[in-house]
Amino acid sequence: MNLRSVAVAVAALLLLSGCAAPGAVTTRDAPPWPRPTDLTARAESAGLRNVWGERLAEHVHTHLTILDGDEPVTVPANIGHSDDRKFAAEIHTHNTSGIVHVESPTEQTFTLGQFFDEWGVSLGPEHVGGLRGELTVWVDGHRRIGNPRSIELTDLRQVVLVVTTVGEVPHLPAPFDWPPQYD
């Protein structure tokens, strides 16, 4: 192989692999992320269990918004929940509203990291699943610095995760309008 062929091969490889700086763009290799089908295993991976039918000592709701730039990412229905299988992990969803339910027979601290572990989607200080770029986190309308995994799921809390391209200014969306049954 001559030098010109090597140069062309290297140029093609760089073009195909994307020679932008790491994290320079948001990737779309994941959303929409499906709900897990193995409810028991996913719950156990998050330190949760099936509490279907148990008397509840704690019942709170947190709203989760995920944005890829300005595009909403749907939080699936029935993460950690199935009426047919009579399964309800302490943290679960019922629909695609973004409302995350915490229903537990004991009062304890549950976190956003546990919810993402149960969902099977990676969450860290610089990414949500396959979305990479700049992660901005708001909790109840206030900017939060640090690892979003540690955010506690408390009643009527609003968590917003926005992944943008480097240098793009993230925008806090309007607050979630809680349905009246949650007041």
Q: Positions of the model-derived regions?
A:
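Bacterial N-terminal signal peptides that target proteins for export
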Residues: 1-7
